[in-house]
Amino acid sequence: MASTTFYQVSNRNIILLRVSIGIVYLWFGALKFFHGYSPAEDLVTNTIAKITYGLLSDHTNLMLLASWECAIRILLISGKWLKPAIISVFIHMACSFTPLLFFPSLSFKHVPYGFTLVGQYIMKNIIIVSAALILWQQQKEKSK
């Protein structure tokens, strides 16, 4: 009986965790659709341009990223196709850490421990990565 109760509470917490990450993706993704609303817009466009060698315009890159983030949101909140959604979160988060390497002067006051506001904005993503790892583990256990 106790283990069943624990599972029910735990399952609710997992749903809350999944929906919370989805809300963050909705908020940050939706802002990118409107020029000047995302505080990360310049950082994002500069990073993507560096990764892709300027293959697409900044506007196109921003719209693609916003669409990707909103798609992740839909999958996480709906609970559909969770494994692809979580893999997308991992890929997105890996990319979100690249400004630490590409633009250290924007990310650090004192490398490697003194973050700027931009660096703090990037490092908070470690919380999303940790939450996604919990979701991934839960999906693995469900598929057993």
Name every feature range the model reports, one short phrase each:
Residues 1-144:
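Membrane-interface extramembranous regions
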